[in-house]
Amino acid sequence: MKIDILTLFPDMFTGVFGSSILKKAQEKEAVELRVVNFRDYTTSKHNSVDDYPYGGGAGMVLTPQPIFDAVEDLTKETERKPRVVLMCPQGERFTQKKAEELAEEEHLIFVCGHYEGYDERIREHLVTDEISIGDYVLTGGELASMVITDSVVRLLPGVLGNHASQVEDSFSTGLLEHPHYTRPADFRGMKVPDVLMSGNHKNIDEWRHKESLRRTYTRRPDLLEERELSKQEKKWLEQIKEGK
């Protein structure tokens, strides 16, 4: 996979893309990450990429020319048109399902905005997707693009050493992840549940499944509205509601 990120602040990505999973993914050649300063594409004699909005108003608006030219340059040798994703608070809310969808692509281009917003023609005639990572305001789209890149890249084949860990992550199954424990078995009187040390894998799996359901019910009940519960899950949920 290839991911290009268009930004005015490329230095922001150095630490994130040079660490942890994203660094390993590049070393394994599972992904090629490129950070491009779209100011390099401006034809303005003042090297500007924004201008005052027509009709007046506060703030500056990103002009279409440098972003269009950057995307066209990055895709001039590609046979299949890539997904061009705008980081935008008005966009579709980012979810695990969306990450899995994007992970199927060969080439992604993320456009990070700044200032007051984008010229509407970028939305209408260039991008294929608009994505928001939450209902809050960020200074620019850079942090959002880092979040999405990490979420997508870790799904690529061979990136994570433990596939089971990926499958069990929160949201991958539609439920929040179950609690985890490690040594010591008794820490200041706080003990690990006996079932986890029983060696009975069937009981352990059932405990983890039920605790995932419990955690989802108490913390993110909205996720259960989107999930078709099995007969056993419905039974557990009734027990959970009764405090069992």
From Swiss-Prot:
Location of this chain's protein in the cell: Cytoplasm
Keywords (A to Z) from UniProt: Cytoplasm, Methyltransferase, S-adenosyl-L-methionine, Transferase, tRNA processing
Protein name: tRNA (guanine-N(1)-)-methyltransferase
Family in the record: Belongs to the RNA methyltransferase TrmD family.
Gene Ontology cellular component annotations, sorted alphabetically: cytosol
Reactions accelerated catalytically: guanosine(37) in tRNA + S-adenosyl-L-methionine = N(1)-methylguanosine(37) in tRNA + S-adenosyl-L-homocysteine + H(+)
Family annotation (CDD domains): TrmD-like (cd18080)
Species of the source: Bacillus anthracis
Pfam families the UniProt entry points to: tRNA_m1G_MT
Keyword DNA damage: no
Sequence positions that bind S-adenosyl-L-methionine: G113, I133, G134, D135, Y136, V137, L138
Ranges in coiled-coil conformation: none
InterPro entries: Alpha/beta_knot_MTases (IPR029028), tRNA_m1G_MeTrfase_C_sf (IPR023148), tRNA_m1G_MeTrfase_TrmD (IPR002649), tRNA_m1G_MTases_N (IPR029026), tRNA_MeTrfase_TRMD/TRM10 (IPR016009)
Enzyme Commission designation: 2.1.1.228
Function summary: Specifically methylates guanosine-37 in various tRNAs.
GO BP annotations listed: tRNA N1-guanine methylation
Subunit structure: Homodimer.
Main enzyme class: transferase
